[in-house]
Amino acid sequence: MMIRELDIPRDIIGFYEDSGIKELYPPQAEAIEMGLLEKKNLLAAIPTASGKTLLAELAMIKAIREGGKALYIVPLRALASEKFERFKELAPFGIKVGISTGDLDSRADWLGVNDIIVATSEKTDSLLRNGTSWMDEITTVVVDEIHLLDSKNRGPTLEVTITKLMRLNPDVQVVALSATVGNAREMADWLGAALVLSEWRPTDLHEGVLFGDAINFPGSQKKIDRLEKDDAVNLVLDTIKAEGQCLVFESSRRNCAGFAKTASSKVAKILDNDIMIKLAGIAEEVESTGETDTAIVLANCIRKGVAFHHAGLNSNHRKLVENGFRQNLIKVISSTPTLAAGLNLPARRVIIRSYRRFDSNFGMQPIPVLEYKQMAGRAGRPHLDPYGESVLLAKTYDEFAQLMENYVEADAEDIWSKLGTENALRTHVLSTIVNGFASTRQELFDFFGATFFAYQQDKWMLEEVINDCLEFLIDKAMVSETEDIEDASKLFLRGTRLGSLVSMLYIDPLSGSKIVDGFKDIGKSTGGNMGSLEDDKGDDITVTDMTLLHLVCSTPDMRQLYLRNTDYTIVNEYIVAHSDEFHEIPDKLKETDYEWFMGEVKTAMLLEEWVTEVSAEDITRHFNVGEGDIHALADTSEWLMHAAAKLAELLGVEYSSHAYSLEKRIRYGSGLDLMELVGIRGVGRVRARKLYNAGFVSVAKLKGADISVLSKLVGPKVAYNILSGIGVRVNDKHFNSAPISSNTLDTLLDKNQKTFNDFQ
């Protein structure tokens, strides 16, 4: 089927043809035949790079041309940004695109001017909770990566969000995009959707297992030169020599960095100098935007054509790595499986060095087939690679046979809803009541009876959990159940002021309850300055930053840091020294409770160092985390501190101003005195303190700065960017030279250095 045959505007057809899309792939043609452009619901369960995004675009374009609005739901912020950039290419045709991934307690009514809105599932759920005005104008919903219904963390929110959208507008078109899963037909039936199920790919995928000196594919072999001890390094070198790129999936962050260091010394020997000079530019940008030892290690690897990628890196470094790989400068990325979760970074060859993952309950366990297929599916760049290869590594023949049977030749597992637990349901029961989707127990049962969980399981199982959630919400004064004035046999459910606020703040009701109880333990106040209060048990509490930081760290919404053996003494000594700052300390004899409390305190200690401007390098060393982890914990605690401030206001206690102040400090990782400076683009906590200490305490002071003084302080390029960012016109002729750094020069010299053996 040719794209010019489709019932979409001619100018958009021209846009696609100009970009090389003239004929639809077979799964795309099948979707059109099944009614994609006729507002029919559709589930496309097809491999990576088989044209799922085009299906979404066509459905959204058709909806917009008919006066509708489209919502594109993604699981990850990074994927939202990627799709937003792609859809912005439709702007010349009058299609406005917006993105929303941020504040989870805002209505974002301004987004309503757009034709396509890109949002994460959590943000979409938040918009529904906050009564966003344009939500009922949505006529087409695209759900990307719908197989994540199977995820314990993200699945329940995605499932309830889809259910709400279909309830809000029964005529909405749902276009669901999925990996190939075992029960795609069941998912399609739940959605009332036609199913496109296909294994077709534009680039052939060869899945195999390396055993000995050959990759063994079903029915064929490929010999690999064993130049190095590490088989994965040999695969990498083989790929680069054939002008391809590699993704290497590891089981841990440490292994990612370790393999990158090992491989980089070998890869550098076969790269052109021109490429290495360009790599040097990326490496120097990594060094200039990082404060940690990890940044130095990453930069050194990048100089040699290899990078590592995981959640412990800061977002700037992850983007630099991704862009360097897309530009075919970085030849190898060693990554944790997070890279396979949605980002569009295909490669000629995918190497899966470890097929086991650590489980805290069961130790090292084999990964699911679906996870393997997601990683393998990254192999083969459409229109660039003649084929793609995914390779598992086996040490013995038995392991080789097992990997072939259990992964290469296996089908992906069925998807199962994770909604049926009190932890998963609690927040959604509250929001369903607060937002008016249900006002009685029966209406609540009916609403959740339309979920995927109810479609797969017996409804009575769900009703039992819903009743448990209701008892909790009623006990915590977040929901009331009252008799109907006219009919005493009818009981109506209502969200209280507390319940409504908790729902809008997008926190777990258990988190809301813990924060409220914490404030009650600290004590109530009618006003005045902060100081010592007496809690309900008669103990003096001195309210400090740590008091509030620990309060939010004690909630289930906050990810706790693990306790290492070396942490117990340090954290316990801190607790003893600061015992008057905690609203509650468990009895040490209750070992499980006390150990959990210590984990909360350790997490709060990290945040305390963050807001008091301890360097990121020192924090990573003190707490054994990555720079990306610091920012992730800061993001979560900022959101929870905002919630605590709002709840303090509702309760009438005096700590809301302290909480709001901490919220700002957590956002920037600095003291309040730097707030004006850290608001300048490109000025973080470190540069802001350097500027402040040099007398540049405000934007006004910076506007009068001598450019030479500023350049000596932060470097010419940064000085230029700062002044430009605050509206100062600067002659940029002095900022264009970019000399090669000593590290880059050393790398080039090492690469070209001759040894005695070269002359034998």
From Swiss-Prot:
One of its GO terms (biological process) is DNA repair. It catalyses: Couples ATP hydrolysis with the unwinding of duplex DNA by translocating in the 3'-5' direction; ATP + H2O = ADP + phosphate + H(+). PROSITE patterns: HELICASE_ATP_BIND_1, HELICASE_CTER. Residues 33-199 form the Helicase ATP-binding domain. ATP binds at Q28, I46, P47, T48, A49, S50, G51, K52, T53. CDD domains: DEXHc_archSki2, SF2_C_Ski2. Pfam families: DEAD, Helicase_C, Helicase_dom4_arc, HHH_5, HTH_61. SMART domains: DEXDc, HELICc. Its EC number is 5.6.2.4. It comes from the Archaea. DNA-dependent ATPase and 3'-5' DNA helicase that may be involved in repair of stalled replication forks. This is ATP-dependent DNA helicase Hel308. It comes from Methanococcoides burtonii (strain DSM 6242 / NBRC 107633 / OCM 468 / ACE-M).
